[in-house]
Every structure is written in structure tokens, then in C-alpha cells.
Amino acid sequence: MHLCAQDAPSPDAPPPPSKAPAPSDIGPMGPDAPTLKVNVNLVNIYFSARDKNGFVSSLRKDDCQVAEDHNPQVIKRMTQEKNLPLTIGILLDTSGSQTNVLPLEQDSGARFLREVLTPKDEAFLISFDVNVDLLSDFTDSPRELARAINKASINTASSSAGVPGIGGGPFPTSNPRGTLLYDAVYLAAHDKLQSQTGRKIMIILTDGQDEGSQLKIKDAIEAAQKANVIVYPILIADTQQYFMAGEMYMGSSAMGQLAQQTGGRVINVGNNGRKLEDAFDQIQDELRTQYLLSYTPTNRNPDGTYRKIDLDCGKGLKIQARKGYYAVPGGESGNIE
């Protein structure tokens, strides 16, 4: 499969947005808020629940209550999704700031894929630096993915011909130097994950610093939400490099927004290999205890308005889920059918 970034914006225009809502339709996060597509009859929410001891895997439908725009909803179905096919996108930061930690990322990433992937699952691998490159397309082979991960290398060279998209397609930028993190998230979500079904997650191994992307963090968030993908940024950084260069390390804020809005979470591991392995283990545990809750909304009008979702499962549990959606007709609703 050969992909390019033809749907991405030119330097003079932002990416094509969703149909703009009328002023009265704008939700609490504004017109640029993330979109969770639904069908007319069903809203699906992937979520995890934790208490002080870790993830909780024993919840039943009657334990939870969901409200949409403060109106109670009747939960139609709630199941644990251990066996639903899983699609994983691994995004690997290969910019110069990752020189000292790339070997850790390669070792832990390959181990994670060996342990998680089953024959019904698929994963792909993207690297990003001054370019965004597809190192491995969808495959269920951990060995093939490991080979691709091990071929990743640090790239600090400048490009005079713009930044190529996935598969070598044009992705114009006015500043071809840097770390194209936001562009990579957009391309992974829009070009690779949006057309997939089942559970979808994106794991980003990065220091969280973006430099030179044509897109903004809000564009990356919107693309991830439209693809119905849960994003887990793993912040791995040799911060000493920043101090030695006289620069501030400020990578956590944008990644926190991306994780929160998509129902994922940020895991900060510094430059510690053991913590990185633990981070992957935490994500595995979360996938094994993830729930899919479905309800038929009382407001069945797919009018594009923002609907706030409040999910509570009591018992002092911390619920990790997206916070709402725009009711877009004909969109993906979670793929449980």
C-alpha cells in the first residue's frame, strides 16, 4: 500500500476541517474540539478504570452510569475487549535529541510487539525527524516489525525539497528542519488508522518536542479523534542534552493534551530503560482490562453538535475515557457490530 499526504494542507492553508458547526453548535471546547464519530443509533466508548491498586477488571454494566449533556443514558452493552482485533501504530522519534535513547526505544518497542501481537492483530511503524517515513506497513509479524525498528536511525539532515509524507508523497513545509511530531501523528491517524476497524492505539516514543511541523497540536488531536484512536505518548528524553545546549525541555504539555483528548495517558520515563519497559507493560495491562461501553443516545439527531459525556463507575475509581464527541452522521462509532 502506497500512501502520500495529498490530503494534508499546503503551507498557505490549514488541513481540511470537519464541517464547521454553526455558532450555536459550538461545544465547550470550541469549533476545533475533537470529534468522535457516531452512527445514529449507537455511541461507543472505550475506557479503563483504576483504583489505588491499579487497573480494575471486574466491572459490570450495572456498576456504571453515563450521561450525555447531563442527561442520563441507558447503557446497552458493556464488555471487556480482550479479544477484539487490535491495530497498533508505533511512532518513533529519530531526531537528533533522541541519539542517546534510540537503542532503548528499539529494544523495548520490539519486545512489546512480540508480547502483544496475535495473528488477528496488526501494527505499523513510522519514524519522524525532518521527514515522516513509513518503516513498516501493516503486518502481524513481530519479526518484520523488529527488523524495521532496528533499521531506524537518527536523522539530523536538512531537506531542501520539503518534507515527504508517508510513502514519499509531498508534505510541504516552510521549515524543513526539526522534529515533525504533529505532522507524524496527523499522517498516522488520517492516512493509516482512520480506515481501520476494531481497537486502535497509537504509541509515540518521543521527547515531546515539535519543531517544524506544518500542522498544530490541535490538528493532530482532531485527526486522532476522527480515527477513533487512543494515544499513549511515552516521554523518553535525555534532558541533560537540553541543559548542555542551553535549551528548555518543554515536551510534556502538548502530549498531555493529545493523550487526554483521545482517552490515553502520558507516561514519562526519562532516559531510564527499566522505566520504559514498565511503561510498555502498563499499556499491555490496560489493553487487557479495557472496556467498551455502548449506549443509544436519547438525542438521536446527528446534527454535528457537541455532546459532553460523563462516565462514572463509582467506588472511587479513576475513569480514563474521552470526554465527549460531535454527533457526525455516518461516522465510525466504535466498530462493535
Short names for language-model regions:
Residues A5-E337:
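Scaffold/interface architecture of coatomer-like assemblies
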Residues M1-H2:
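Bacterial N-terminal signal peptides
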